[in-house]
Amino acid sequence: MRKRQKMKNLTVCILVSILAAGCTNEFNAVYKSDNYEYKYEFAKQCFARGKYTQSAALLGELVTIYKGTDNAEESLYMYAMSLYRSSDFEAASDAFRKCCTSYPKGTYTESAYFYVAESLYESSPEPRLDQSPTLAAIKAYQDF
């Protein structure tokens, strides 16, 4: 009985490992691809599935390529949000600021202003350290 349970656990572990390796291989293939539309769609899928690190890696490259196109605003906002959700708050605040300045009347501008403040707040250090990021977060909340 006990041996049977161990075999079952081992089988489950092997299947999970194979699936994880398959997903990683797919990401690597997409990342190396020159098909930007496919990369963009895959990045959106990663974002929807909560794979924000992969989404940020793909969108970071696509933001400059899509500048001036119909997908530019959405790709920049999704890139910033991917950084935020993967806890890279300093880079996220910069990306959200870029979103605000590049598209001042855009679809995501109001939300981007809010997330500038949130990113700065999240990156604030503990009270005994330099509070420049905290003051910047307070100002960003006031601007929002």
Predicted segments with their positions:
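Bacterial N-terminal signal peptides
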Residues: 12-20
